[in-house]
Amino acid sequence: MSFPCKFVASFLLIFNVSSKGAVSKEITNALETWGALGQDINLDIPSFQMSDDIDDIKWEKTSDKKKIAQFRKEKETFKEKDTYKLFKNGTLKIKHLKTDDQDIYKVSIYDTKGKNVLEKIFDLKIQERVSKPKISWTCINTTLTCEVMNGTDPELNLYQDGKHLKLSQRVITHKWTTSLSAKFKCTAGNKVSKESSVEPVSCPEKGLDIYLIIGICGGGSLLMVFVALLVFYITKRKKQRSRRNDEELETRAHRVATEERGRKPHQIPASTPQNPATSQHPPPPPGHRSQAPSHRPPPPGHRVQHQPQKRPPAPSGTQVHQQKGPPLPRPRVQPKPPHGAAENSLSPSSN
């Protein structure tokens, strides 16, 4: 490597080291200032009193070496944009802080002779404000929880009746084993904000949690609604089935009645004699009187046997008198002897 190249490299290295040392020194001597995201902040110059000898006050960002505001006598105050506002006492106001406003700010003050009478550096850091912590507990699990939802680098602290219990970042969980009745306080904070919540907690040794009671009531209500719907559904199905069966029975009865009406026979006249055997008996011989039937039974061996006759079917719609039991036997008719023969038979006896 040639001598000119070595000289340039050495110069750049020395300049880089000196620049880093100056920046580190500025950060070390900087005043740490905290701002809340979305809020305004005033960068006040400590131990400074405005006088007529002051001619120039200049503010700049050290990250880009850019002038953001300047005050000079008998001249209009300079500001880079509406975000900044410079007061006559040298205070710089930054409106509606954003994350990119986090930087190192430097103020330089000169008198009318051009002499630097004061120089201050501010290390501005921005955080999001913490939200109010939320305290919740359950008596069944004997557990209390404190948590914070929003905020940059929050710090939680839990107290019971003024006694510090735990420290955490986002969530604190506390358990107990006996009955409890105490006042809990949970605080959340960071560099720019602080919030707290207080809750009186009362848990008997054998108590029911309000959420358990609500769950039981809700489950019971749902069960009752389900049972009512089930009963309604079953009843409706039974009614539909009964109505369908009634319609089927009515249709079947109508069909049977129609078929019977089509098969009905014609009426038969009821002029048939009840005992045809009497009509077949031969008439008595001439000259003989028929004797009235006596009530004596005929001698044995001479009983007339009548064969049963088939009765004609009774016509529909008419009532036919039917004789109960077998037909009664008729007495045998004997012919009366002639009158002359009777006299001849009586004469010898008289002689």
Curated annotation (Swiss-Prot):
Biased composition (Basic and acidic residues): 243-262
Signal peptide limits: 1-24
Outcome when changing residue 67 to R: Loss of CD58 binding
Protein topology in the membrane: Single-pass type I membrane protein
Positions of the Ig-like V-type domain: 25-128
Cytoplasmic side: 236-351
Major place of residence: membrane
Sequence segments annotated as region (CD58 binding region 2): 106-120
Subunit (UniProt): Interacts with CD48. Interacts with CD58 (LFA-3). Interacts with CD2AP. Interacts with PSTPIP1. Interacts with FCGR3A; this interaction modulates NK cell activation and cytotoxicity.
Protein name: T-cell surface antigen CD2
Organism: Homo sapiens (Human)
